[in-house]
Amino acid sequence: LPNHSSMVSGRKLATPGGHGVPFNQDNGSIIHASAGRYVASIFDVVHDNGGTTGMYVGKAKFDFLDRSWNATNGAPDLTGVDNGRDKIDVYQMANSSTTVTALLYQLASSTPMTLSFVHLADTDNAGHAFGFMSAAYLDAVTVVDGYLDQILDAIAADLDLARSTAVIVTTDHGGASGVFDHADPSVAANYTVPFLAWGEDVAAGADLYALNPDR
């Protein structure tokens, strides 16, 4: 949850300036209480500019993020037309097969979401249960790869979507071979993650570090 909070807010954990979420379960509160101030998100930006947003997730801890930007806790929309305070239009927590099916339905509709956040829990669940890089973990990687294929194929099959959609694939942590957790910050495998971008305007073969030399 700390790194997912960073993904959607663009902020580090540590305050001041960060989102202040060190815990990995829904504590029943909201991100703004953790930070000590309102924390804007990618959902705020899209929603307040008239777009639609969705979260399709595989763990109940994401209720924390949905609650943080709901109709009660989201900030007033002060950009153009007032679209209300609920920054996340669709929130679904279920297994990956169900959430991916829902996403594919959205992509095929006449009004697909402007922004979709998709969390696939299969690899994480397998890593914690059977060990990272175990046979069960690698099987889960294959399953998730299949889900990604379905999503990318659905976008590529629609010319308008293909021309206007960018996909970012990443994860919130890694995991060392044979280990069941990722708690040791001194182990590079725990914090080494993929960051892949796909879309019409994405430079093929570009290196993330070369593109961001000052980061």
What are these regions (language model features)?
Residues 1-44, 48:
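Active-site nucleophile/metal-coordination loop of metallo-enzymes that catalyze phosphate/sulfate
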Residues 30-103, 108:
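A substrate-binding/cap region within the structured catalytic cores of diverse enzymes
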Residues 8, 185-215:
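Substrate-binding rim/cap in mid-to-C-terminal beta-strand-loop elements of soluble/periplasmic
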Residues 66-84, 104-150:
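Active-site His/acidic residue clusters
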Residues 26-34, 43, 88-93, 105, ...:
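Second-shell loop/turn segments in exported
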Residues 143-185, 195:
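Metal-dependent active-site segment of extracytoplasmic phospho-/sulfohydrolases and closely related
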